[in-house]
Structures are given as C-alpha cells and as structure tokens.
C-alpha cells in the first residue's frame, strides 16, 4: 500500500461499516447470507473499504466474513478486533480468503473509559497499543488503529497513542467521535494539530468516525476532512449504535455537490445510492424517515406552490443536486393543498391533457376542493377530475336516491341538463345499479346496452376513491365510460353519464358511430 503524503491526497476513502457498526443498531442484525447480499451492493456502489464484522463476537460473523472474503476481490475487507491476542488471531483467520484484508484494532483512550471501562493507566494503554498493533501487523500489512472515544481524550495523550500506533505499524489512524460529543470546530482543530505534530503522521491515513447523538455526524465528518482526514467511516442510511453514524449518502453527496469548495473526490457510484439504501431497508426492516436527506421519500418532493412554480421554471431554484445523480428517477411534484395551478396544469399535460383556459380554471377549482378532503392528489385522482369535468359538459348528476322495493331496487335521479334545467326520473331494476341505469336512460333519453361493469379502488389508503368502468353498446357500437367517487353507486352514475354525454356531443356535431352523419 502506498501511503506517501497520504493526508494531502484529493481522494477520500469511504470506509463503510454498515455490516459491523450499523448492524449493532437494535433490530438491524443480519444473517451471513444477508450480509453477503449487502456487501455485493456496497462493492457495486464503489465503497473502498467494507468493514465486514467482528469475528471474535460470534460464529455467524466469522462465517459472514469468510463468505465475503471468498467472493469480493476489489474492495478492502476489514474486521474489528479488540486489543486482545485471541481476538486478533481469530480475526486474522477469518480474513485468510480475502484478497485485500485489513485488521482494525481498537482501544479506549479517554479518561472516563480508562477509569471505568478498562481500569488501566495511561502507561498500560500505551503498552497495549504497541503490543497489539505489532501483533496484528505480524499477520496482515494493512492495520487500522482506532482510539475509542478520541474526542473526549486529552489531546497530549491522544498524540502519544497515535505516535505509538504508527511506530508499531498502523497504516490508518482512526479518531472516533464515539458518542457524538464533539463539534465541527473542535474536531477540525484536533485533526489539524495531530497531523501537524505527531511523528510519522505523513506515512498514514487519518480517519474519522462520527456518531450522530447530537445530529452532527455529517458536519463533524466534513470538518475532520477539512482538518486533514482522508478516510470517512460511515453507514448506509446512517444506521448504527444509538442515534446512528455519519450517513454514507450524506457525506458523499456533500463532497460531490460542494466539489468546488472541497476539491476532493470519492469513488462512490452515486446513481446506485438509492437502490443500495432501499436494499438495506428491506434486509433489516428499518425504513428511513421521509425527510431523510438524499434517500428519503421527500428528498426531491415539492408541494408548495411557490416552490413548484420555481421548479417548473428551473429545477436549480429549489434543488442542489439532480435526483438522477443518486438513483431517483426524477423530482416529484406532490400535488396537495399547497400546490398552485402551474403544477397542476403541468402534471395534466404530462398525462396527456391539453386544457383551454376555462377548462383549466374549472379543473383547478375541483382540485382545490378535493384537497380539502384528502392530503395527496394522485395521477388517478387527476384523471378522475378530468373525467368529472367532461361529464359536466352535458348532463350533470345533482342527486340520487336508491332504495329497496321488495326483491327489487328503486332509483330516483335528478340531473341538470346542458341548459341548466332540472330533470328527475325514477326506475326499478334487479339491483341498485340496474335501477340507476334505467333512471338515467329515462332522464337523458339515451338507451345503452350494458356489456360489462367493474369497480375498483384508485388513490392511496383512506384517500382512495372508487372507480366504476363500464362497456356499453349503442346502435351496435361499443363505448366505454369511467367515473370516480367516494361512493361506488355515484361513480357508476358518472360512468354512465360519461358515455351518454359523449353520444350527445357526437349528435350535436353530426357524428354517428365515428362517421359524419348525412344531413337531410
């Protein structure tokens, strides 16, 4: 490994610890086969180093590490080990099949950990670091040493620990913010001072590993990079102990979007980010929140009318990266009560509807009325609104009443005709739909022969509406109609009127069965 002038390189190594630190998140454990599936995705994503597990902790981890070692030949495969001889020996054996193995040893260094966890003095910690890094280097050339709880460690002692680890053969020095305690200014200064002052620092890569307990993991990782770190330890979706780790998708896209500021790059194939995120969500059953940066469902969604109008003019007004660059198909214009007319018309055009000014105004009024009843308006809802608008060009349903009369049903319908006059008719039938269609035929004077009739749901969850679809014949010609409503019977009436109004318009234009009618 060439580590000369390593902390001046413009390349940031991405060390993904989803399969080790991430898996320690409650409820996120994976089987060896699941780990292998996830590791393949991380390999395809372009991750430099994959931390595959903690072999000394379980047989399952040892099996998973061995499986990954036999299959994955490009990335460096790392395993975690305590500063214990038995751990290091187990870890080295687990990595025997790996093409590019790394042994990652760690020891706590903060006064709190030294006193209450390790019960060791400064001198004992230094001796252990030297002994176990030397032992690890005897098995594998690529050794990473982590000073656990580095950001709460006295800086003079942290410098001494770092010097000893480098002298013993460590090739990467990781300074973790184990409990998410530090701030960007503090961690930037810590890295900058240590890299400038520790003997041998120019021979190794300095790494940052930040937790998110105060929501600063990504910001602290960027600050560490500014201080000279050239490896970032992170996880997909930010999963990990407690509040999680720095999210790979956040740190990667921050460096890419702000490339002119940082002048640094990664090897991450960013269009694979979303699919990798979604794979992890399926494997561990832990969905990300909708407003999660980069991979959340709302990351590229816009509902505000002002924002939507800006996006329609130029997407850069409200997006700093392209959704396609991280694996989303496109931005989403979420239509809801905050949406403006421009966004509604744009979506209707995308669905194939070209509206005149008066039509657009009417549909937008109907859209706003629908938004008072449901939170999100889908494409199916818009198509239903267009259908309703078409119906309103002829006969309009004013009211209807369906009742049982013995074994038969009775329907009373009241319509507004094209001139605005009210027309009321009743009819009986073998069921509510049969009676309804009979009353509509009497009211409009249009006779339709029913061939097929179907109903199904459109929309999402509690906002779903019923859609009625029917196929009918008139003078031997087949027609299809649809209607939607919260009420299935009303949807059926609208579907029938859809056909009837179309026939009436054809008559007005002198068109019959698709041909121009002869004029006497």
From Swiss-Prot:
Q: Which domain of life is it from?
A: Bacteria
UniProt record similarity statement: Belongs to the alpha-IPM synthase/homocitrate synthase family. LeuA type 1 subfamily.
UniProt-recorded name of the protein: 2-isopropylmalate synthase
Region called Regulatory domain, residue ranges:
396-520
GO annotation, cellular component aspect? cytosol
Give the organism, scientific name: Xanthomonas campestris pv. campestris (strain ATCC 33913 / DSM 3586 / NCPPB 528 / LMG 568 / P 25)
* Role: Catalyzes the condensation of the acetyl group of acetyl-CoA with 3-methyl-2-oxobutanoate (2-ketoisovalerate) to form 3-carboxy-3-hydroxy-4-methylpentanoate (2-isopropylmalate).
* Entries under SUPFAM superfamilies matching the protein: 2-isopropylmalate synthase LeuA, allosteric (dimerisation) domain (SSF110921), Aldolase (SSF51569)
Q: Which residues form the Pyruvate carboxyltransferase domain?
A: 12-274
What processes does the entry annotate via GO biological process terms?
Answer: L-leucine biosynthetic process
Keyword terms: Amino-acid biosynthesis, Branched-chain amino acid biosynthesis, Cytoplasm, Leucine biosynthesis, Manganese, Metal-binding, Transferase
Q: Which InterPro entries match?
A: 2-IPM_HCS-like (IPR050073), 2-isopropylmalate_synth_dimer (IPR013709), AIPM/Hcit_synth_CS (IPR002034), Aldolase_TIM (IPR013785), LeuA/HCS_post-cat (IPR054691), LeuA_allosteric_dom_sf (IPR036230), LeuA_bact_synth (IPR005671), PYR_CT (IPR000891)
An example of a GO molecular function for this protein is: manganese ion binding
Names of required cofactors: Mn(2+)
Pathway where it operates: Amino-acid biosynthesis; L-leucine biosynthesis; L-leucine from 3-methyl-2-oxobutanoate: step 1/4
Q: Kindly state the subunit structure of this protein.
A: Homodimer.
Principal subcellular localisation of the protein: cytoplasm
- Give the location in the cell: Cytoplasm
The catalytic activity of this protein is classed by the Enzyme Commission as 2.3.3.13
Q: Where does Mn(2+) bind?
A: 21, 209, 211, 245
What this protein catalyses is: 3-methyl-2-oxobutanoate + acetyl-CoA + H2O = (2S)-2-isopropylmalate + CoA + H(+)
Instruction: Point out the signal peptide segment.
Output: none
